[in-house]
Amino acid sequence: MRFEAFASSSHGNAYTVTDGGTRILLECGISHKKLQKLSGFTTAEFTACVVSHEHKDHSCCVGDIIAGGIPVYMSEGTAQELEVAGVQIVSHGEEFTVGSVDIVPFNTFHDAREPLGFLFRSRTDGEVLVFATDTVNLAYRFPGVTMLAIEANYDKEILARCERMPEKVRHRITNSHMEIEVLCNYLRSLDLSTCREIYLLHLSDATSHEGHFINKVYRAVPKHVKVTACSR
């Protein structure tokens, strides 16, 4: 199984996971034209798309994806907020299958109607990817995970130095996004014996530091795990 990030920020998010036979688009938060340019794929080449929540940096071209005839999966709350029809409604803990990939949605914690993360398990190679972005924390443990793609949005010490940041913005960050030490503590609680790579998602332009975050995560996980920051 392969994970790839094409956009990962508050300006837009788009990722893919593929196991050779199935190619799934994770989020569609950039323009349709930009998605095709960055990924190198036309809409028709995606088996399906999953959307975590309704915020535009994760969903702005969902109409184009639906119009292209690609199945789109999201929670009922997300579909209602986006006011879209013709999508596949999924819920926490209810497994579904796309091609050769079994997918399990799980609840996340964000200022959205019904946000979800997703676990992907390939029937082709048995690998497991956990995808969770835009969440203040995670309440679940995932045994047998091969790859983690997870939010690492801000550092509380850097945030504290942003004296001119409006209090409303500061409050939203701390109550809906994952702080780097929270992530590290979560990773320490996991059995990562089967994990080969961790991807850090959605790093803030103003309140994160890519090199610092990578080093902190390396200190929190076993030595065999590779850490990659997806900051474009």
Regions found by a protein language model. Give the residues of each.
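Short, hydrophobic beta-strand segments that form beta-sheet elements in well-ordered domains
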Residues: 24-27, 49-51, 69-76, 88-89, ...
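Active-site environment of divalent metal-dependent phosphoester hydrolases
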Residues: 11, 54-59, 80-81, 112-113, ...
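Active-site metal-binding motif and surrounding structural segment of the metallo-beta-lactamase
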Residues: 31-77
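Cap/insert and terminal regions of metallo-dependent hydrolase folds
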Residues: 143-232
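Metallo-beta-lactamase
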Residues: 73-126
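Metal-dependent catalytic neighborhoods of phosphoester/phosphodiester hydrolases
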Residues: 60-69, 84-85, 208-216
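Divalent metal-coordination and catalytic microenvironments
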Residues: 17, 27, 53, 72, ...
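Conserved beta-strand hairpin/beta-sheet module of binuclear metal-dependent hydrolase folds
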Residues: 1-39, 116-134, 147
